[in-house]
Amino acid sequence: MFRTHLVSELNPKLDGSEVKVAGWVHNVRNLGGKIFILLRDKSGIGQIVVEKGNNAYDKVINIGLESTIVVNGVVKADARAPNGVEVHAKDIEILSYARSPLPLDVTGKVKADIDTRLRERLLDLRRLEMQAVLKIQSVAVKSFRETLYKHGFVEVFTPKIIASATEGGAQLFPVLYFGKEAFLAQSPQLYKELLAGAIERVFEIAPAWRAEESDTPYHLSEFISMDVEMAFADYNDIMALIEQIIYNMINDVKRECENELKILNYTPPNVRIPIKKVSYSDAIELLKSKGVNIKFGDDIGTPELRVLYNELKEDLYFVTDWPWLSRPFYTKQKKDNPQLSESFDLIFRWLEIVSGSSRNHVKEVLENSLKVRGLNPESFEFFLKWFDYGMPPHAGFGMGLARVMLMLTGLQSVKEVVPFPRDKKRLTP
């Protein structure tokens, strides 16, 4: 057994007890007669005291930072130490030595740029800040799942090797599939629609791939997509569901990750339900009134969303009813204005984190929608054929986990919140 306790479990009530702890050497101070080691494990940092004359003293006198050790010792209450206790070592076993000097300072005293951090990623992931990020992510994903389970959704898994473009675009990674061309899925969209046509309420948390040329803080070539599809629903039902998901997610993180948020020195935004809605058309007019050169049909990009955020003064808001031709072929038109669609984006300040819509469920309408966009319905026959068999009205959304994590952590780049990000320049580690 490598340990009896995590360092966070040590407390003054254990004074005089013999314990075994294990972890990484976070810092060392040699005061001549004593060596103080800060030992780090998954739960935090604790203090180890090694007295001169002890068998362990010679073992650690030249120990390098980030070496892994097991400490047998006795707990002593000391208000000056982390958690009010320290462990006086009786024996120390060196499990592995770390080479010195380290290519990255895990303590954070010496700052590193993002390229260095990504190159030396394992050491970077040992930093308390990165461990806080990954704990927050775990709680956020758990919250997402739990909310959907409570609403009767079923978790599903869709193919990631596909025959044609899901969105009809060109941002695809081709792969050779037994002599035939195939692609990595850019979205589970078509398959989750089919699944909703069978079991009504489905969701998936899985990787997706887009051959993004954009080298921005908000784009990756490989990302985790959190997708939902719901039968007998429209985009208003979906927006109401998203409000519950985001509300629960933020509050679960605040409740379960109090220490991690302190490490990051950040507080996620408060969610006010209902979340404010502004139509695309009204957003365009508001932007024009502020001197932005934009017209109906244009995308509302990050610079424009910054202006919108400054005017709306809302951390979270929906932009609804986008032009139909600006959305994917499966998006439903508004009955009262076919130029517009039953669609939305959820924006965090100036960053899109969710996109969704009501979906077309009539085959002939879908075929026409494909043709209008210059796409061949025959390429989508595997999808369209099932609309001959009672496809219900349905709606859904896709949520980018990395972007949601920017909202939950206050960090500025998706590369910071993904353990091993993939972009145009990076295939390793």
Curated annotation (Swiss-Prot):
CDD domains: AsxRS_core. SUPFAM superfamilies: Class II aaRS and biotin synthetases, Nucleic acid-binding proteins. Mg(2+) 3 binds at residue 352. Mg(2+) 2 binds at residues 352, 355. Residues 189-192 are annotated as: Aspartate. GO terms for molecular function: aspartate-tRNA ligase activity; aspartate-tRNA(Asn) ligase activity; ATP binding; magnesium ion binding; RNA binding. Keywords: Aminoacyl-tRNA synthetase, ATP-binding, Cytoplasm, Ligase, Magnesium, Metal-binding, Nucleotide-binding, Protein biosynthesis. This is Aspartate--tRNA(Asp/Asn) ligase. It comes from Saccharolobus solfataricus (strain ATCC 35092 / DSM 1617 / JCM 11322 / P2).
